[in-house]
């Protein structure tokens, strides 16, 4: 059973889990992969419980005014607020929104653009469940990929992060290009 135990104080978060991790409003955030690999684009992120469970469980902590950029998933995603106050917004333009607090839950359907931000006054935590053993991939709105590239961050066609300031794109890989406006809508 010890390989199925995750103590929060023993988890090792990624502080650069996604392509937008260097952008203002996204860089003071930690991502934890607790059960399964989740959708983190950081290939070095530690996965605490690696055996398949039929779902993936992770956690996100963020400082005030930090969270994720607009993105979609190919699997359902459920957020369980543990602490703090979070704004969730959705749609290709991100104009629909709600505020959630400790104990609240929201289930985001597949292929819908969504994002979240800590709107409280201290670091806050939530748990995230992704459906299925295969958590699928993330699709970012074009603006996020373009701004991330300006910081040197890009995504490769295997959905892994690359720091263009440190390394070149491997010959057997291509960078993911932003989706078109038609694909966004």
Describe every region a protein language model picked out:
Residues 62-65, 100-120, 131:
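Conserved metal-binding segment of the jelly-roll/cupin
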């Amino acid at each position: 059973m010890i390989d199925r135990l995750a103590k929060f104080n023993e988890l090792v978060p990624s502080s650069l889990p996604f392509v937008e991790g260097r952008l203002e409003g996204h860089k003071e955030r930690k991502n934890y992969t607790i059960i399964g690999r989740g959708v983190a684009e950081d290939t070095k992120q530690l996965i605490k419980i690696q055996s398949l469970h039929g779902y993936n469980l992770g956690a996100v902590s963020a400082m005030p005014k930090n969270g994720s950029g607009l993105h979609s998933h190919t699997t359902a995603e459920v957020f369980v607020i543990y602490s703090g106050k979070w704004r969730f917004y959705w749609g290709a333009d991100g104009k629909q929104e709600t505020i959630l607090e400790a104990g609240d839950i929201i289930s985001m359907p597949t292929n819908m653009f969504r994002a979240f931000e800590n709107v409280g006054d201290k670091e806050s935590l939530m748990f995230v469940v992704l459906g299925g053993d295969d958590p699928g991939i993330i699709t970012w709105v074009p603006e996020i990929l373009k701004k991330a590239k300006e910081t040197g961050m890009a995504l490769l066609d295997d959905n892994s992060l690359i720091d263009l300031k440190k390394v070149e794109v491997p010959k057997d890989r291509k960078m993911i290009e932003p989706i078109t406006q038609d694909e966004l809508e």
